[in-house]
Amino acid sequence: MKLIIGVITLFPQMFDALKSGVIGRALKQDRLTLSFWNPRDYATDPHRTVDDRPYGGGPGMVMKFEPLALALKAAKAQLGENTKVIHLTPQGKLLTQAIVREKIHASPLILLAGRYEGIDERLIEAEVDEEWSIGDYILSGGELPAMVLIDAMTRLLPGVLGHKDSASQDSFTAGLLDYPHYTRPEKIADRPVPSVLLSGDHEAISRWRLKQSLGRTWQRRQDLIKRRSLSENEQRLLDEFFEESS
């Protein structure tokens, strides 16, 4: 068995750390192949811009659709058009050893490592097959989670270790998953930015974001909702989310 993984990242040099230890051994044995695509190489403006301000306001920047889409296109041209794309994000399903054991047989895989406040939601809708999280905490980007996943999968390759060493992590904190992010352009194909984010009504934007966070958490991490004592307003927003999604 050989593991083939492509990574979309603004910082491919971070992955030099994988040349040591178990993963380094797998690379030398040709049991693991890693390839990298930097979205900045696919930016079309003179400044090689990969991020922009978020619609609806708020802190930070959001990674733009086009450079990521072009990087993914290049990755799929090399690895195969049907290669699954995995986005590493706190909004994803919790990565477990069972998932690692399952996905090692899904190689090749493309891992998408975001930065800043997140990735334009329309890129996720159009290109991402699954979203995974390594835990309920925030990191500066998706590179470390991608390395965690690569490490966990590589350890299961026959012959890389003297034996298969499984581990589990069950330390969580209560909270809600993030709401969707959008940045320019205002419309991509048939996917427009939600109109409320263009309204300039900050109260309505805050309400929409909380509703999306509650709904997304219920859909993906009900355990977090069950730990949380919802206020009357939060319960009302969650009910609205169900009605709008039905």
From Swiss-Prot:
It catalyses: guanosine(37) in tRNA + S-adenosyl-L-methionine = N(1)-methylguanosine(37) in tRNA + S-adenosyl-L-homocysteine + H(+). The keyword Nucleotidyltransferase does not apply. It holds the Pfam family tRNA_m1G_MT. Keywords: Cytoplasm, Methyltransferase, S-adenosyl-L-methionine, Transferase, tRNA processing. S-adenosyl-L-methionine binds at G114, I134, G135, D136, Y137, I138, L139. GO terms for molecular function: tRNA (guanine(37)-N1)-methyltransferase activity. InterPro entries: Alpha/beta_knot_MTases, tRNA_m1G_MeTrfase_C_sf, tRNA_m1G_MeTrfase_TrmD, tRNA_m1G_MTases_N, tRNA_MeTrfase_TRMD/TRM10. It is found in: Cytoplasm. It comes from the Bacteria. Its main location: cytoplasm. Belongs to the RNA methyltransferase TrmD family. This is tRNA (guanine-N(1)-)-methyltransferase. It comes from Coxiella burnetii (strain Dugway 5J108-111). The gene is trmD.
